[in-house]
């Protein structure tokens, strides 16, 4: 019988409580020195299928051969740039300087309270006057869930996305050029690239320590104490309190998680190429642009997911994969 093993459950994610909102938030962005561009996008998870593609991984046993790869389908209709927000830095850290809002934001009436007057010209002058102190240029973009048949919501999801590349003036000018317009994901990422996928996981509610942390069920005499699914010990005699590392019952799921370096297998516009017979379970048919991501991603169907340029990419050669077949078989069993 094995007497020594790693502790049950990871200590990397604490406190294990529910996320504050359904829209994931990024605290960091990758470095980029090229032409100004957006570093993120968002879509809605439709479901999973599989593709048959040519294995282009160097020195792989199946290099050059057909392999079956599971993929996640994300529906990505165009997003609209609602505002520009610039940050300056002082002794207390970064804080917003001002914002430039676009006109005709009736679509956001259910999400924010619109100001009676739009002082975009005054805000633009203020930013240009302090452009030497600007450290970050962000844009506020919102999704269009009304264009999706699989997502039963009307209110857009509003989020902040970083503009990277070039000087602060170049980034601000680029943000002004796309203010109030629709942006497509194809202008940001391409097939074969790697991206970070962030979402809010499935909520499991209040769960015990066995399911939440994977602790071992108590056996023999200990199981007959009617505490078969309890932790074996709450800790030592001293210190005289239960430490936070002890597996305890509590909230499980509905937490923000990021998966790094997920490969983009395909970006397309014709949804008939990937819609399975009968549609995706708990979602339906994809009717807009879509992206296929290798592997699984956090969250259930219909859940908003954010896509960011890879932060831990390293130096890897980018090449578009050769997809020979996309499964259209029914997912209903």
From Swiss-Prot:
Cellular component (GO) terms are: cytosolic large ribosomal subunit
Q: Does the keyword Ribonucleoprotein apply?
A: yes
Q: Name one Pfam family in it.
A: Ribosomal_L3
Question: Which GO molecular function, any one, fits this protein according to its record?
Answer: rRNA binding
> Looking at the keywords, is Phosphoprotein present?
no
Q: Which NCBIfam families match?
A: L3_arch, PRK04231.1
Q: Which family does it belong to?
A: Belongs to the universal ribosomal protein uL3 family.
- Function of this protein? One of the primary rRNA binding proteins, it binds directly near the 3'-end of the 23S rRNA, where it nucleates assembly of the 50S subunit.
Assembly description: Part of the 50S ribosomal subunit. Forms a cluster with proteins L14 and L24e.
Q: Which named protein is this?
A: Large ribosomal subunit protein uL3
Q: Which species is this record about?
A: Methanocorpusculum labreanum (strain ATCC 43576 / DSM 4855 / Z)
Phylogenetic placement of the source organism = Archaea, Methanobacteriati, Methanobacteriota, Stenosarchaea group, Methanomicrobia
